[in-house]
Amino acid sequence: MKTVESLTDDFAEYQELIGRARDAFDSVVALSRARAIAYDANADESRYLLDPQRRQRYAQAFLAKSQQLYGMQGVTLATYDDELARTWQAYEQDHGDLRSTGEFRRELDNITYTGERAATERTVEAHAVYQRDDRKIRALVAKGHEREAVEFCISWDPGMSNAHLGAYMDALGRVITINRDHFGASVRSGRSTLTELLPWCCGLLVAACALTVLGPRPPLAEFR
């Protein structure tokens, strides 16, 4: 039979499971949004190659989406890579460093599970590789080597841009999987704990109602 102390412990465990589930759910939502932004940025990169008349617009759109993922103050496409390297080094020395923003920063500030930080860090590092590929594409275009730029952009051969994009999305997918698995586990554990608590909580509620009704009776007897 459960004591009040054990019921309190069970309720505290249930509250902790709710907190873990909320953290995992928030991460799944944020990282799924990050994946959509990354694919959209990749589409802007392709449009940049296919539509010479609107290249400036697509370049700015790519930068804006890159900033949503890993943001830094005052950067341009020309300075993004160096600033990413600088701020990432600062983060590695101090995880509380606040020189970067964006979806990846939010995930790094919401680390809960074993392996989650390492997986997120690998995602940021893969993002950096993909960003450097983008700069190579634009440099080739600037030199008039558009065919070579297109080949580098769309090829899945090792070392080419799409291969790096695939590795980037795989790394991001692993972080999503970690959080999704823990979310499911927390929900199942929480449901099990709640199932155990519910009969006892109902019993305590009935007892409280009974005491509320019966408690005033002795004093009222004086007025009969």
List each model region and its residues.
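Individual transmembrane alpha-helices with interfacial aromatic-anchor signatures
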Residues: D26, C153-S161, L194-L198
